[in-house]
Regions:
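Gram-negative bacterial Sec-dependent N-terminal signal peptides
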Residues: 1-27
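Surface-exposed loop/turn motifs in large extracellular/passenger domains
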Residues: 27-44, 49-71, 77-98, 104-126, ...
């Protein structure tokens, strides 16, 4: 009978592990993030970075003569929507790639209502208040 109890316990443990071992990934929006970059960054910087969701109402500020050796995105979505994001560039050094208010990398997500404010500094590639690498519309950005 002792072996039966051990087998039952092991069966219950195996069942629990099987039910919880898989990772369920759901689309998750990134909203309301505020990020200030005041020291130079070696890579791309983000206000909100949504891997599989929308980037909504995020803010990125680059201040105190900080340089960025990549791009600066206030709202970045890999495949959904990027709306209402704000990029502020004040007293900065150089952004060596692009400065983007809102950006959707692929898919049909809308890019709207994003803003870029630039007081001083240099952007080597491009400045876009809102753009997309996908098929969605980019409208109402400034």
């Amino acid at each position: 009978m002792k072996n039966g109890k051990v087998f039952l316990r092991l069966s219950v443990i195996a069942l629990l592990l099987a039910c919880t071992s898989g990772t369920i990934v759901q689309a998750e929006d990134v909203s309301g993030k505020v990020n200030e970059v005041s020291e130079s960054a070696e890579d791309t910087v983000y206000g909100g970075n949504a891997v599989d969701g929308s980037a909504l109402n995020n803010q990125l500020s680059i201040t105190k003569e900080a340089s960025v050796n990549g791009s600066a995105y206030s709202g970045y979505s890999s495949n959904r929507e990027a709306s209402g994001n704000t990029l502020k560039i004040t007293r900065t050094g150089t952004i060596y790639e692009s400065a983007e208010g809102g950006y959707v990398n692929s898919g049909s997500g809308a890019v709207s209502g994003n803003k870029v404010f630039m007081e001083s500094g240099e952007v080597v590639q491009s400045i876009n208040s809102g753009s997309t690498g996908g098929s969605g519309d980019a409208t109402g950005n400034s």
